[in-house]
Amino acid sequence: MSEPLTIGIKRLPHGADLPLPAYQSAGAAGLDLLAAIAPGSKLTLEPGERRLVPTGLVLQIPPSHEGQLRPRSGLALKAGVTVLNAPGTIDSDYRGEVGVLLINFGAEPFEIARGERIAQLIIAPVTRAVLVETDGLEATARGAGGFGSTGAAAIGETRR
């Protein structure tokens, strides 16, 4: 395992009493983010509704890294609630509050309580590219095939 990366974090007043994001197991890749909705209230996501849920946190991610907001698998499996723009990107130069865009794909309203774990934060390295315009590109076996062109039929099936 590599050396831990230091991330600056600032709690906003509406999230000051909540625990900081934390890894929930020794092998966890993501830090769990909590909902910083008003104390004593709940946020209800109706079926098909999307909402930006506050975390009460501002991050200082080092240059050459990003934060990725990803769904919690349990919320998706049990309630159909997921991060709509997964993975959401937090750029290293962003200094606003981290918000999690959740959507309820489930059939029932879903209530989010203050302090509930709503998403995972993954810190990842970023590779910046330099684009070079050209008149021709190297040929490949795949060519311009896309949208299912590399999928294989199951054994005994014929692709149509």
Curated annotation (Swiss-Prot):
Broadest EC class assigned to this enzyme: hydrolase
Cofactor(s) for this UniProt protein: Mg(2+)
GO biological process: dUMP biosynthetic process; dUTP catabolic process
Keywords tagged on the record: Hydrolase, Magnesium, Metal-binding, Nucleotide metabolism
Binding site for substrate: R72, S73, G74, N85, T89, I90, D91
GO function terms (MF aspect): dUTP diphosphatase activity; magnesium ion binding
InterPro entries: dUTPase, dUTPase-like, dUTPase-like_sf, dUTPase_trimeric
Function of the protein: This enzyme is involved in nucleotide metabolism: it produces dUMP, the immediate precursor of thymidine nucleotides and it decreases the intracellular concentration of dUTP so that uracil cannot be incorporated into DNA.
Protein name: Deoxyuridine 5'-triphosphate nucleotidohydrolase
